[in-house]
Amino acid sequence: MSLTKRLLHIHPRCSFSKRSHPSADRNSQPISEALLSQVDKTTENLQLLEIASGSGQHAGFLAPLLPNITFQPTEYERNQFGSIAAYAGDCPTRNIRPPFHVDITRDPGDWEAPPAPASYDYMFNSNMMHISPWSCSIGLFRAAGQLLKKGGRMFTYGPYAQDGILVPQSNVDFDRSLRQRDASWGVRDIKDLKVLAAENGLQLEKLVKMPSNNKFLTWLKL
């Protein structure tokens, strides 16, 4: 059964049309370069879990570049499943699985499709932490601590402060606008994320500065 048919059987009201976000189009190249430089591109049957896949664009442009890695998209908003499936269906390497629902604030054992502990080589999360409550960041690192294999890596992308300093002014303005929209949102400080990492058996391994004042962070599972 095709991916689309399988997902349609589970979610009969899905609309299988690609959604496109300009920001994902813009950051696809730099994210690809940062991720490809840090993953194993030869070992077969590696597994990557993406948290908050959104439209599915990231998996859509990354998976064909890494045919040895199987991508598992997840998303809280079920109305995104059709778009994710559309990107997966067009993937020439056929290494994107059907998405499943994840509330990242919940323990992985309570997810709709609970993964086995230490079952993933990689995790990836883009542009979630600043537009979600702090409880989502807590849950993200908890999931990484439980689901990554020893020596596995979680990659996170987005705007971040460092040791209480947020630059440039455009990021300061962006943070202010986020908090005005929702007091629980806001650009996260890497020093606070390091605390979450340590609590879950991870450490910051690498920081790559990206275009548009974003950063690509690599978290190593110890």
Curated annotation (Swiss-Prot):
One of its GO terms (molecular function) is methyltransferase activity. Coiled coil: none annotated. Transmembrane segments: none annotated. Pfam families: DUF938. InterPro entries: DUF938, SAM-dependent_MTases_sf. Belongs to the UPF0585 family. PANTHER family: UPF0585 PROTEIN CG18661 (PTHR20974:SF0). This is UPF0585 protein CG18661. It comes from Drosophila melanogaster (Fruit fly). The lineage of its organism: Eukaryota, Metazoa, Ecdysozoa, Arthropoda, Hexapoda.
